[in-house]
Amino acid sequence: MKEGIHPEYREVVFMDVQTGNKFITRSTIHTRETVEMDGKTYPLFKCDVTSESHPFYTGAQTRIVETGRVEKFRARFARTAGTVKSAS
């Protein structure tokens, strides 16, 4: 492999902005901010959404149930089912 073409792969702290939760993982991301954690200084990346705050993972997700095509058809024509147009 060629030297000097690969980005630096290092430990980075990702912080969830909504919850304030921080976790360390490895990444090639470049940041200007740093944070001290466990006695070491790490680059800090602030995330808007992580598994700590996303509604799908927290169980706070509300499911929108859409009625199907058949139900929409039945609801629309249920009103007119009792009335019959005269053929005059």
UniProtKB/Swiss-Prot annotation:
Annotated Gene Ontology cellular component terms: ribonucleoprotein complex; ribosome
PROSITE patterns named among the record's database cross-references: RIBOSOMAL_L31
One Pfam family named in its UniProt record: Ribosomal_L31
Keyword set, alphabetical order: Ribonucleoprotein, Ribosomal protein
Gene Ontology MF terms: structural constituent of ribosome
Assigned protein family: Belongs to the bacterial ribosomal protein bL31 family. Type B subfamily.
Entry protein name: Large ribosomal subunit protein bL31B
Organism: Bordetella parapertussis (strain 12822 / ATCC BAA-587 / NCTC 13253)
Encoding gene per record: rpmE2
